[in-house]
């Protein structure tokens, strides 16, 4: 997968991201960027508005990296302007610009 292949994802109303093996965001779609209300690129969850939830989020990322298996979970995170929310999440192993990564797609459960 390459950055140019993901342009259609920017039009989708769900959150989509790609993280490198260190947990840094290397691609996010417009919905996630708008929700975060701060620059995400190159940062980890520990540096974001949902930093209190970073340990659990990173644990799920590591499971995918270690096993190579797709993970379907509910994650809990603090979303700026909304407070604590439950997210329905699918994380999967992939490749981005030639490097191993974890991609994810999620939406808030109302």
Name every feature range the model reports, one short phrase each.
Residues 1-25, 30:
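Sensory modules in modular signal-transduction proteins
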Residues 33-47:
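PAS and related sensory helical modules
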Residues 49-66:
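PAS/Per-ARNT-Sim sensory domains
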Residues 60, 71-77, 88:
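PAS and PAS-like sensory modules
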Residues 76-82, 95:
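PAS-family sensory domains
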Residues 89-102, 109:
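Short loop/turn elements at sensory-signaling interfaces that couple input to output
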